[in-house]
A protein has these predicted regions:
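C-terminal transmembrane helical hairpin of 12-TM major facilitator-type secondary transporters
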Residues: 316-350
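Transmembrane alpha-helices of Major Facilitator/SLC transporters
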Residues: 46-50, 287-312
């Protein structure tokens, strides 16, 4: 079960680097801080498009490399290439070329972000699906727990990379419009870990052929080859219970809040704590590193609160309390001007 999910560790590092640094990268390239949200539309949009497609087509893919593994490998390779090119967008002498008000560097970054988020989704989804494919019902909880642990561990590593590289002496400032070396090397290191972890899972895990898969799940071989799914997406949504829609509505607003956090944390912390909005300044880039640290604190808070929730007799009470605590964390960011006090805000969000 560990081998099945180990690649997820590398994928999550890539995802954490994207979450913590995309606003910083585009602001450094010259994007207006007030329009950063337009760039951030792309990751959830790609997720909405790619995740159902990967599920649909990997259900029907049976080849000598496996069922889910071909998508996993292709997604990882593309993600690695993009992670090498994206942080160098400001170093390619494209800043002078303008189209629709955006410099060539920003267009390069924009298309790189599209490919990065698409490839991360392509690499991420097969790990979740392989647990359903290959783990029996009694062990699925354990398998998903391992995956959750690796997910959080990968997030922590990805978040702290820029701060760590700066701490060991790699430059955290650069000429205007150029991404600092601390961020560039973070993406390089993340790319290396990603491909190593994914290749480990790729070679250590052997997926079931259609006949064995059908026997394992107690379905007809023909149905297994079709993916075992008779209903389309819209039919499944139509038949979904009311609880699905209730939780979905809450999640809708939660993810809206998280998107604000990912988009504007860098600028807000730079202005409130370091007192600067100059993206080329040492203070702004230091704030960018600190974003990774507070995001890591948020991840720790999430892990610890997940251990507390089962102790509630009424889970609805736990979820309501969770939302109120998170809301308090979001509001407090505006009023805090000390970098270490931000630990409280982001811990509450977690």
């Amino acid at each position: 079960m560990f081998n099945l999910s180990f690649g997820f560790f590398g994928v999550q590092i890539a995802y954490a680097l994207q979450s913590a640094n995309i606003s910083r990268i585009f602001a450094t390239l010259g994007a207006d801080p007030h329009t950063l949200s337009f760039f951030w539309i792309l990751p959830p949009l790609m997720g909405m498009l790619v995740q159902p497609l990967i599920g649909k087509y990997s259900d029907r893919t049976w080849c000598r490399l496996g069922r889910r593994k071909p998508y996993l490998l292709i997604g990882a390779i593309v993600a690695v290439l993009v992670m090498i090119f994206l942080p160098n967008a400001g170093s390619l002498n494209l800043s002078s070329a303008l189209f629709l008000g955006l410099s060539g560097a920003m267009w390069f970054g924009l298309f790189s972000l599209i490919f990065l988020d698409t490839s991360i989704n392509v690499a991420m989804q097969p790990f979740k699906m392989m647990v359903g494919d290959m783990v029996n019902e009694e062990q699925k909880a354990t398998a998903y727990s391992i995956q959750s642990f690796l997910c959080n561990a990968g997030s922590l590593v990805g978040y702290v990379f820029p701060y760590l590289f700066t701490w060991i002496g790699i430059s955290n400032i650069a000429p205007e419009g150029v991404i600092p070396d601390s961020v560039i090397y973070s993406f390089y290191c993340g790319a290396a870990i990603l491909i190593i972890c994914v290749l480990y899972t790729f070679f250590m895990v052997k997926e079931m052929p259609p006949k064995e898969y059908a026997e394992f799940h107690g379905i007809e071989p023909q149905k297994a080859e079709r993916g075992g799914q008779e209903s389309g997406l819209f039919k499944l949504l139509f038949k979904a219970p009311s609880t699905f829609w209730t939780v979905g509505l809450v999640q809708f607003f939660c993810w809206a809040a998280f998107l604000y956090m990912w988009t504007y944390s860098n600028g807000a912390i730079a202005a409130n704590v370091w007192g600067t909005t100059d993206v080329a300044s040492e203070g702004y880039q230091a704030a960018g590193n600190w974003v990774g640290i507070v995001f890591a604190v948020q991840a720790v808070g999430s892990i610890l609160w997940a251990l507390v929730i089962p102790r509630f007799k009424n889970l609805k009470t736990a979820y309501i309390l969770s939302l109120l605590i998170g809301a308090a964390g979001f509001v407090s960011i505006f009023f805090i001007h000390g970098q270490y006090l931000l630990f409280v805000s982001y811990f509450l969000i977690g």
